[in-house]
C-alpha cells in the first residue's frame, strides 16, 4: 500500500511538472499610426502579410487588424502566437520581412504592447 501511494504521488508530481513545462502562448497588441498618404498601400501590404502568415505559419494563431473608425490612419493588431518561438520564427519569415521593409517609410509610429489574456484557454471562433 505504501509503495502504491508513493507511486501515485510521483505520478501526480510528474503530471504537474509537465503541465508547467508547456510553453505559454504569446499575445501582443501592435498599435500603429500610418502616414495618411500611404494608407491604401499600407493596407494592401498588411493584408498580404496577414494572409500569408495565417496560411503558412501554424504557430501564428491570430493576426487580427482593426482600423479606428474616427482616425483611419490608426490601427491595432491583436497578435496571438502559439509560443515565443513561433513569434521569433514569424518575424524572420520572408513574407513578414517583405511587409516590414516595404512599409517602414509608411509608418508614423509603432508601439508593441505585450499583454496577458484574461482567459487564455478561450479560442477565437
Ranges and model annotations:
Residues 1-8:
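Bacterial N-terminal signal peptides that target proteins for export
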